[in-house]
């Protein structure tokens, strides 16, 4: 950290342009107003595709970085408005159409529902009996559990929150308009990274966490403590009563009687009745202890508020981001991070790529924590919700990581300047990209052949009736010894590395079985040969996804095959006529291929999770403590062959969706069929060339001309890239809908 003389650096200040862009509904009402060519209107059907492709591609509309920055900033507010409207709708459904109050009174016997279908032509069958005399569609978003943890005790509070969401949405829409049309920040404001870091760290993350910790302590915890003790929701004081009448809090948490005295006398241990370090799960609800999560958010708040004072703005003290980056040199890394500051303040694609990679990874980590450490009350015994939350967060994370590859490649094509990056880390990566990609390719081949080979071996041995020669827990063992060691370490943590904790962070590592209402909430997950094998399939598919995305970024500007890629742009079908064998080399095509492998990777991950949990975790607990799992522990012996995966997982568990006709789950049956249809439809776009369709169209146009009904707008076949885009979109949509129907019909049947 350096203390700088005040005259050396420009002062950070808020600088705006007043009324830079007029508000014109007349202009906005004209399709394609953002692009001179598109604004002329359609001559061919390609126009509508280009309209969609370029509407949000601000780089194609202007080369002025300041204007692009303002458009992105304004779009962020628009996005937040959409999020608030969406959230408001969720809360409104909870208030108006749900059985939340009934569920709250009996959460272990009544299932959550927030949608009742109108019986127009017999759809009333979808309204299943969820208990307590309520008929509706069972929901698996986990919102009821979140609401209970937040301290909602009746539908009126949900209504109020829904209205609050709409107010916030209106505010965001206004802000988006205001900061583009009335007071638009100058470029230097967007590039003032130190102020941004301080604001985001201390303000958004620090004070945001502090506010949430405050809500948890003053509202959530007292209400949940009373609910856990069996007090009826209508008899629980309202949230503001706990805040205005400290005596009500002191009855539940005695330290409240002492007020702030222990805080200012540094006698903080007094507060350990509501800021705890227990570990494990609350045995009543199967969720994390709210006093642990409040403590966690308070600690996070302290850390981030401190972190938000690290960067130098107008007071001559603190870090400069540019200095940190330029000082970051290793013995073998040349100029190190020199030049990266300029990249990250002038290329929003580079910035976005890094943020997407980090946020995508974080989202996947969230997926793992949602079941290992279920944060909300009663969430852990709703198996359909647990499966839905895991799948949802895995897929979202996957899309974000592919997005990182996409924007990394766009940065390389549009924003990278080789002359400004000489011998820094980025330049050095690009210069030894062949070594990186060829090694990664070798790793993929090694993992692919070996992991798949283990399955092929097992299928063959089982077919030949030689179980003693198979890789399994009962024959040739391949135990995941490192994973077991990590589990053991975490199980021993209470009393060793975390001496004040009462239980391990997650019972997935080891410890006891937590049962709520006779169902397993969480228990130790034993790992064996079957897990070892499928984990190497995960390693294989993840490395292939990384290979495709990384190759797309590193070869986005040039390759031996197409040296002038940078001139061709981010997306192009082939290197022009007369150069065969140069298709699918653009940055866009790598994203296109990366999406398939991302989907491939995550399908195996969610299948593994679904079967493993049903086999070895989820189930019923009898009074003597013995556990009966949903699929009776068949994972260890069935998941070691390909045939086992096909027969005992896909086929056996598809019974619920295939046989759903005539039941409340029948919507999943039709979605299962529709998903397969959409998937098959995608292959029509992926497996046929543009010429086929152009020929067909010209024949159809000829017929129209014969009948004098020729269209004014000339029909054109989709371009090669457009066809691929439509293909991959339907491939993923069809696959996701099929998996959704398969998982939900299955998990709602066992729930």
UniProtKB/Swiss-Prot annotation:
Chlorophyll a' binds at residue 676. InterPro entries: PSI_PsaA, PSI_PsaA/B, PSI_PsaA/B_CS, PSI_PsaA/B_sf. The chain crosses the membrane at residues 72-95, 158-181, 197-221, 293-311, 348-371, 387-413, 435-457, 532-550, 590-611, 665-687, 725-745. It is a multi-pass membrane protein. It catalyses: reduced [plastocyanin] + hnu + oxidized [2Fe-2S]-[ferredoxin] = oxidized [plastocyanin] + reduced [2Fe-2S]-[ferredoxin]. The keyword Nucleus does not apply. GO terms for molecular function: 4 iron, 4 sulfur cluster binding; chlorophyll binding; electron transfer activity; magnesium ion binding; oxidoreductase activity. Chlorophyll a binds at residues 684, 692. [4Fe-4S] cluster binds at residues 574, 583. PANTHER family: OUTER MEMBRANE PROTEIN, OMPA-RELATED, PHOTOSYSTEM I P700 CHLOROPHYLL A APOPROTEIN A1-RELATED. This is Photosystem I P700 chlorophyll a apoprotein A1. It comes from Synechocystis sp. (strain ATCC 27184 / PCC 6803 / Kazusa).
């Amino acid at each position: 950290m350096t203390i700088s003389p005040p005259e050396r650096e420009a002062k950070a200040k808020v600088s705006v342009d007043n009324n830079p862009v007029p508000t014109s509904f007349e202009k906005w009402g004209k399709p394609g107003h953002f692009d001179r060519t598109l604004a002329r209107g359609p001559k061919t059907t390609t126009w509508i595709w280009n309209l969609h492709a370029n509407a949000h591609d601000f780089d194609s509309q202007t080369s002025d970085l300041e204007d692009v920055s303002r458009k992105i900033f304004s779009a962020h507010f628009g996005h937040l408005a959409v999020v608030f409207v969406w959230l408001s709708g969720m809360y409104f459904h909870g208030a108006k159409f749900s059985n939340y109050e009934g569920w709250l009174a009996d959460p272990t016997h009544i299932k959550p529902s927030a949608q009742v279908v109108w019986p127009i032509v017999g759809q009333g069958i979808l309204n299943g009996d969820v208990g307590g005399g309520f008929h509706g569609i069972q929901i698996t978003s986990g919102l009821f559990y979140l609401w209970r943890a937040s301290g909602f005790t009746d539908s009126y509070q949900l209504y109020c929150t829904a209205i609050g969401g709409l107010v916030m949405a209106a505010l965001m829409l206004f802000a988006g308009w205001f900061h583009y049309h009335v007071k638009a920040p100058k470029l230097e404001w967007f590039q003032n990274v130190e102020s941004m870091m301080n604001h985001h760290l201390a303000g958004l993350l620090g004070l945001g966490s502090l506010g949430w910790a405050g809500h948890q302590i003053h509202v959530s915890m007292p209400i949940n403590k009373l609910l856990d003790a069996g007090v009826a929701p209508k008899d629980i004081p309202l949230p503001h009563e706990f805040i205005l009448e400290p005596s009500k809090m002191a009855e539940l948490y005695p330290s409240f009687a002492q007020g702030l005295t222990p805080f200012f006398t540094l006698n903080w241990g007094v507060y350990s009745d509501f800021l705890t370090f227990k570990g494990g799960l609350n045995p009543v609800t199967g969720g994390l202890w709210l006093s642990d999560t409040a403590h966690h958010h308070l600690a996070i708040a302290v850390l981030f508020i401190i972190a938000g004072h690290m960067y130098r703005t107008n007071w001559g003290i603190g870090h400069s981001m540019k200095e940190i980056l330029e000082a970051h040199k290793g013995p073998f890394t040349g100029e190190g991070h020199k030049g990266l500051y300029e990249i990250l303040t002038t290329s929003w694609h580079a910035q976005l790529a890094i943020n997407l990679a980090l946020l995508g990874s974080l989202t996947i980590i969230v997926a793992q924590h949602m079941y290992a450490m279920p944060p909300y009350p009663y969430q852990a015994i709703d198996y359909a919700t647990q499966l839905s939350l895991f799948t949802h967060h895995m897929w979202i994370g996957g899309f974000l990581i592919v997005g990182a590859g996409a924007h990394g490649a766009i940065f390389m094509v549009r924003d990278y300047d080789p002359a400004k990056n000489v011998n820094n880390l980025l330049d050095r990566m690009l210069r030894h990209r062949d070594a990186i990609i060829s090694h990664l390719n070798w790793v993929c081949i090694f993992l692919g052949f070996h992991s798949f080979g283990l399955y092929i071996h097992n299928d063959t041995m089982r077919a030949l009736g030689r179980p003693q020669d198979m890789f399994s827990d009962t024959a040739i063992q391949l135990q995941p010894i490192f994973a077991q060691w990590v589990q053991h370490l975490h199980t021993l943590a209470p009393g060793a590395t975390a001496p004040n904790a009462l239980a391990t962070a997650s019972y997935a590592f080891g410890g006891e079985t937590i049962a709520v209402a006779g169902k397993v909430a969480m228990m130790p997950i034993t790992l064996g040969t079957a897990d070892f094998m499928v984990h190497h399939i995960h390693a294989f598919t993840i490395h292939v996804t990384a290979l495709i995305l990384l190759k797309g970024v590193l070869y986005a500007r040039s390759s031996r095959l197409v040296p002038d890629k940078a001139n061709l742009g981010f997306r192009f079908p082939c290197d022009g006529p007369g150069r065969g064998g140069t298709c699918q080399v653009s940055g866009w095509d790598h994203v296109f291929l990366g999406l398939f492998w991302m989907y491939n990777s995550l399908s195996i991950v969610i299948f593994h999770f679904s079967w493993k949990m049903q086999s070895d975790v989820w189930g019923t607990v009898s009074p003597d403590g013995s556990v009966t799992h949903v699929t009776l522990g068949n994972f260890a012996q069935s998941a070691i062959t390909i045939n086992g995966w096909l027969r005992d997982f896909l086929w056996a568990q598809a019974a619920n969706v295939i046989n759903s006709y005539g039941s409340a789950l029948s919507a999943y049956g039709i979605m299962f069929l529709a998903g397969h249809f959409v998937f098959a439809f995608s292959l029509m776009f992926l497996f046929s060339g543009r010429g086929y369709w152009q020929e067909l169209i010209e024949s159809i146009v000829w017929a129209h001309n014969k009948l004098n009904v020729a269209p004014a707008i000339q029909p054109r076949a989709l371009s090669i890239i457009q066809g691929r885009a439509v293909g991959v979109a339907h491939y993923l949509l069809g696959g996701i809908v099929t998996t959704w129907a398969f998982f939900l019909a299955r998990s709602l049947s066992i729930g």
